[in-house]
Amino acid sequence: MKNEMLALILAGGQGTRLGKLTQSIAKPAVQFGGRYRIIDFALSNCANSGINNVGVITQYQPLELNTHIGNGSSWGLDGIDSGVTVLQPYSATEGNRWFQGTSHAIYQNIDYIDRINPEYVLILSGDHIYKMNYDDMLQTHKDNLASLTVAVLDVPLKEASRFGIMNTDSNDRIVEFEEKPEHPKSTKASMGIYIFDWKRLRTVLIDGEKNGIDMSDFGKNVIPAYLESGERVYTYNFDGYWKDVGTIESLWEANMEYIGEDNKLHSRDRSWKIYSKNLIAPPNFMTEDANVKDSLVVDGCFVAGNVEHSILSTNVQVKPNAIIKDSFVMSGATIGEGAKINRAIIGEDAVIGDGVVIDGSKEVEVIGYKEVAGVPNED
């Protein structure tokens, strides 16, 4: 079996900075934009880029993520020559197989990669919101005769110290990599998206393990090793919308940016669709007293209150006189009569009691999965 490029999505992160939202699910399984989960963006990019085989590497709380991905049919990745394979840690005769880092997760799955036998491997994070044509990145990789290509995004200089920064020459060849530098020399921030020549990466990972050299992380170990050995390492410059939604604030911001006709993600672009697992729900119902403005309301919602600049996911109930503003409400949540919610993220199947006030005007408030805030009305 031969495929030119295999995609490997790193989806095992716990996402501790998302607090209550990831207590029972992996970060890539967190809901986004009303009808999606975060991993849908990486999977859809793969499908739209013509990548036939995708490995999803999981670790922390994988059940919801595994169920969501299923056999890959939602992304058209269930054909004779295509597929999604969920790769989890396992025990072997040589010992524990728990993943120790990003590149260690790849090393532990060499047998799977060898079965696909790709010429190139595309490494992706499963927790970013963006649209990218990976085929364009691969062409750049080939044109540069690169051994490794790193996707980068120009960021404001004041924010550059939060990222791994790539310093390049005039031909976009990387001459230096700095991990979260205090005084950055450039603004080219790594997006955590890499294309490697598989044979070379395979050798580097195996030799590192054999010789006791730490090669467990791409940013800390592998990229510096490539640069030190003189490998041809280049950037792929991306200028579209990209958001790391690893914090409560950034997840809320991304959802708010998703609303409206002028959303930066161009969600209505039919030439590059974002696919997800289809959920069957009845049509929305809004009472005559409902007031919905500048909001995204997904199927199955019952709205009898007021909703402004917010997202209501599948099967959300908003009872009379409730007010929701600048908030993201996940599927199955119930908002009680007269409740007031401002700048908040309400988790799946959460219940907000009658008259409860959740005010995130100073800091975005979060109600977790199945959490009950206040005493719900038994009716």
UniProtKB/Swiss-Prot annotation:
GO-annotated biological processes: glycogen biosynthetic process
Enzymatic reactions: alpha-D-glucose 1-phosphate + ATP + H(+) = ADP-alpha-D-glucose + diphosphate
Enzyme superclass (EC): transferase
Reported function: Involved in the biosynthesis of ADP-glucose, a building block required for the elongation reactions to produce glycogen. Catalyzes the reaction between ATP and alpha-D-glucose 1-phosphate (G1P) to produce pyrophosphate and ADP-Glc.
InterPro entries: ADP-Glc_PPase, ADP_Glu_pyroP_CS, GlgC_bac, GlmU/GlgC-like_hexapep, NTP_transferase_dom, Nucleotide-diphossugar_trans, Trimer_LpxA-like_sf
Protein name: Glucose-1-phosphate adenylyltransferase
Domain of life of the source: Bacteria
EC nos: 2.7.7.27
UniProt keyword list: ATP-binding, Carbohydrate metabolism, Glycogen biosynthesis, Glycogen metabolism, Nucleotide-binding, Nucleotidyltransferase, Transferase
Subunit structure and binding partners: Homotetramer.
Originating gene: glgC
